[in-house]
Protein backbone atom coordinates (compact mmCIF):
# COMPACT_ATOMS: atom_id res chain seq x y z
CA UNK A 1 0.00 0.00 0.00
CA UNK A 2 2.83 2.38 0.89
CA UNK A 3 4.76 1.48 -2.28
CA UNK A 4 1.66 2.38 -4.31
CA UNK A 5 1.44 5.73 -2.55
CA UNK A 6 -2.00 4.97 -1.12
CA UNK A 7 -2.76 6.79 2.11
CA UNK A 8 -5.73 5.95 4.32
CA UNK A 9 -7.19 3.17 2.15
CA UNK A 10 -10.66 1.75 2.45
CA UNK A 11 -10.27 -2.00 2.94
CA UNK A 12 -12.78 -4.55 1.68
CA UNK A 13 -12.33 -8.11 2.90
CA UNK A 14 -14.32 -11.31 2.53
CA UNK A 15 -13.52 -14.50 4.44
CA UNK A 16 -9.70 -14.85 4.63
CA UNK A 17 -9.41 -11.37 3.07
CA UNK A 18 -11.30 -10.10 6.10
CA UNK A 19 -8.63 -11.60 8.34
CA UNK A 20 -5.97 -9.74 6.33
CA UNK A 21 -7.99 -6.50 6.56
CA UNK A 22 -8.39 -6.85 10.33
CA UNK A 23 -4.65 -7.32 10.83
CA UNK A 24 -3.76 -4.45 8.50
CA UNK A 25 -6.27 -2.05 10.07
CA UNK A 26 -5.09 -2.89 13.59
CA UNK A 27 -1.55 -1.80 12.65
CA UNK A 28 -2.11 0.97 10.10
CA UNK A 29 -4.22 4.06 9.53
CA UNK A 30 -7.16 3.29 7.23
CA UNK A 31 -10.15 5.39 6.18
CA UNK A 32 -12.76 2.63 6.60
CA UNK A 33 -13.23 -1.13 6.51
CA UNK A 34 -15.90 -3.31 4.93
CA UNK A 35 -15.91 -6.88 6.20
CA UNK A 36 -18.20 -9.43 4.60
CA UNK A 37 -18.46 -12.86 6.22
CA UNK A 38 -14.91 -12.32 7.45
CA UNK A 39 -12.62 -14.72 9.28
CA UNK A 40 -10.83 -13.64 12.44
CA UNK A 41 -12.68 -15.20 15.37
CA UNK A 42 -11.32 -18.59 16.35
CA UNK A 43 -14.10 -21.10 15.78
CA UNK A 44 -15.56 -22.98 18.70
CA UNK A 45 -14.84 -26.64 18.20
CA UNK A 46 -16.89 -29.57 19.39
CA UNK A 47 -15.50 -32.75 20.90
CA UNK A 48 -16.38 -34.49 17.61
CA UNK A 49 -14.18 -32.06 15.69
CA UNK A 50 -11.15 -32.81 17.88
CA UNK A 51 -11.85 -36.53 17.72
CA UNK A 52 -11.80 -36.31 13.91
CA UNK A 53 -8.63 -34.21 13.79
CA UNK A 54 -6.64 -36.38 16.18
CA UNK A 55 -7.83 -39.66 14.67
CA UNK A 56 -6.66 -38.33 11.27
CA UNK A 57 -3.26 -37.39 12.74
CA UNK A 58 -2.97 -40.82 14.33
CA UNK A 59 -3.95 -42.46 11.03
CA UNK A 60 -1.23 -40.49 9.19
CA UNK A 61 1.42 -41.90 11.51
CA UNK A 62 0.18 -45.46 11.94
CA UNK A 63 -1.10 -46.44 8.49
CA UNK A 64 2.29 -46.37 6.74
CA UNK A 65 3.62 -48.78 9.36
CA UNK A 66 0.60 -51.08 9.16
CA UNK A 67 -0.16 -51.20 5.42
CA UNK A 68 2.78 -49.58 3.68
CA UNK A 69 3.52 -46.06 2.56
CA UNK A 70 1.85 -46.17 -0.89
CA UNK A 71 -1.50 -47.60 0.28
CA UNK A 72 -1.48 -45.36 3.33
CA UNK A 73 -0.94 -42.24 1.22
CA UNK A 74 -3.88 -43.18 -1.00
CA UNK A 75 -6.21 -43.68 1.98
CA UNK A 76 -5.01 -40.48 3.65
CA UNK A 77 -5.66 -38.42 0.50
CA UNK A 78 -9.15 -39.95 0.16
CA UNK A 79 -9.96 -39.02 3.75
CA UNK A 80 -8.49 -35.52 3.33
CA UNK A 81 -10.60 -34.96 0.19
CA UNK A 82 -13.77 -35.81 2.13
CA UNK A 83 -12.95 -33.75 5.22
CA UNK A 84 -11.11 -30.67 3.95
CA UNK A 85 -12.48 -27.57 2.25
CA UNK A 86 -11.90 -27.17 -1.49
CA UNK A 87 -9.28 -24.45 -0.82
CA UNK A 88 -7.49 -26.72 1.63
CA UNK A 89 -7.60 -29.72 -0.71
CA UNK A 90 -6.15 -27.75 -3.64
CA UNK A 91 -3.34 -26.28 -1.55
CA UNK A 92 0.23 -27.53 -1.42
CA UNK A 93 1.32 -29.19 1.84
CA UNK A 94 3.09 -25.96 2.85
CA UNK A 95 -0.03 -23.88 2.17
CA UNK A 96 -2.16 -26.41 4.08
CA UNK A 97 0.01 -25.85 7.14
CA UNK A 98 -0.30 -22.07 6.74
CA UNK A 99 -4.08 -22.25 6.24
CA UNK A 100 -4.49 -24.43 9.34
CA UNK A 101 -2.41 -22.05 11.44
CA UNK A 102 -4.27 -18.98 10.17
CA UNK A 103 -7.75 -20.43 10.61
CA UNK A 104 -6.95 -21.29 14.21
CA UNK A 105 -5.47 -17.88 15.06
CA UNK A 106 -7.88 -15.70 17.01
CA UNK A 107 -7.68 -12.00 16.09
CA UNK A 108 -10.05 -10.77 18.81
CA UNK A 109 -7.14 -9.22 20.72
CA UNK A 110 -6.32 -6.82 17.83
CA UNK A 111 -9.89 -5.79 17.01
CA UNK A 112 -10.12 -3.09 19.73
CA UNK A 113 -7.08 -1.41 18.08
CA UNK A 114 -9.06 -0.71 14.91
CA UNK A 115 -10.05 2.96 14.88
CA UNK A 116 -11.65 3.17 11.43
CA UNK A 117 -15.42 3.01 10.86
CA UNK A 118 -16.19 -0.62 10.05
CA UNK A 119 -19.13 -2.12 8.18
CA UNK A 120 -19.90 -5.77 8.88
CA UNK A 121 -22.16 -7.34 6.23
CA UNK A 122 -23.05 -10.92 7.13
CA UNK A 123 -25.21 -13.78 5.97
CA UNK A 124 -27.24 -15.26 8.81
CA UNK A 125 -26.90 -18.72 7.24
CA UNK A 126 -23.09 -18.52 6.99
CA UNK A 127 -21.61 -21.74 8.39
CA UNK A 128 -17.94 -20.97 7.57
CA UNK A 129 -17.88 -17.72 9.60
CA UNK A 130 -21.11 -17.75 11.62
CA UNK A 131 -23.16 -14.69 12.52
CA UNK A 132 -21.95 -15.05 16.12
CA UNK A 133 -18.47 -14.08 14.83
CA UNK A 134 -19.90 -10.87 13.35
CA UNK A 135 -21.65 -10.03 16.62
CA UNK A 136 -18.39 -10.54 18.50
CA UNK A 137 -16.53 -8.31 16.00
CA UNK A 138 -19.22 -5.65 16.39
CA UNK A 139 -18.64 -5.66 20.16
CA UNK A 140 -14.83 -5.57 19.86
CA UNK A 141 -14.27 -3.09 17.02
CA UNK A 142 -15.03 0.35 18.51
CA UNK A 143 -16.78 1.93 15.49
CA UNK A 144 -18.39 -1.15 13.91
CA UNK A 145 -21.93 -1.68 12.70
CA UNK A 146 -23.53 -4.93 11.59
CA UNK A 147 -25.96 -5.47 8.71
CA UNK A 148 -27.45 -8.98 8.56
CA UNK A 149 -28.38 -10.46 5.19
CA UNK A 150 -31.23 -12.82 6.06
CA UNK A 151 -31.19 -16.08 4.17
CA UNK A 152 -27.66 -15.53 2.84
CA UNK A 153 -24.68 -17.77 3.46
CA UNK A 154 -20.92 -17.26 3.29
CA UNK A 155 -21.13 -15.27 0.05
CA UNK A 156 -23.74 -12.76 1.23
CA UNK A 157 -22.31 -10.01 -0.99
CA UNK A 158 -23.07 -12.14 -4.07
CA UNK A 159 -26.29 -13.70 -2.83
CA UNK A 160 -27.72 -10.25 -2.02
CA UNK A 161 -25.61 -8.19 -4.41
CA UNK A 162 -28.01 -5.25 -4.78
CA UNK A 163 -28.43 -4.92 -1.02
CA UNK A 164 -24.67 -5.20 -0.50
CA UNK A 165 -23.98 -2.47 -3.06
CA UNK A 166 -26.62 -0.17 -1.55
CA UNK A 167 -25.28 -0.78 1.96
CA UNK A 168 -21.68 -0.12 0.93
CA UNK A 169 -22.67 3.06 -0.94
CA UNK A 170 -24.55 4.33 2.12
CA UNK A 171 -21.63 3.45 4.40
CA UNK A 172 -19.12 5.22 2.14
CA UNK A 173 -21.59 8.07 1.51
CA UNK A 174 -21.55 7.51 -2.25
CA UNK A 175 -24.61 8.63 -4.22
Residue positions per predicted region:
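Catalytic histidine neighborhood in serine/cysteine hydrolases
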Residues: 138-155
Amino acid sequence: VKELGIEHPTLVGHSFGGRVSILYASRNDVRSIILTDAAGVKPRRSFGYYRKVYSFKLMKHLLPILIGKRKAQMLIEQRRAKAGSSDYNRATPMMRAILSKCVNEDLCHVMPKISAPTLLFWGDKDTATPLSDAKKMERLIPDAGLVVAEGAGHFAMLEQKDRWIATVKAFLKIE
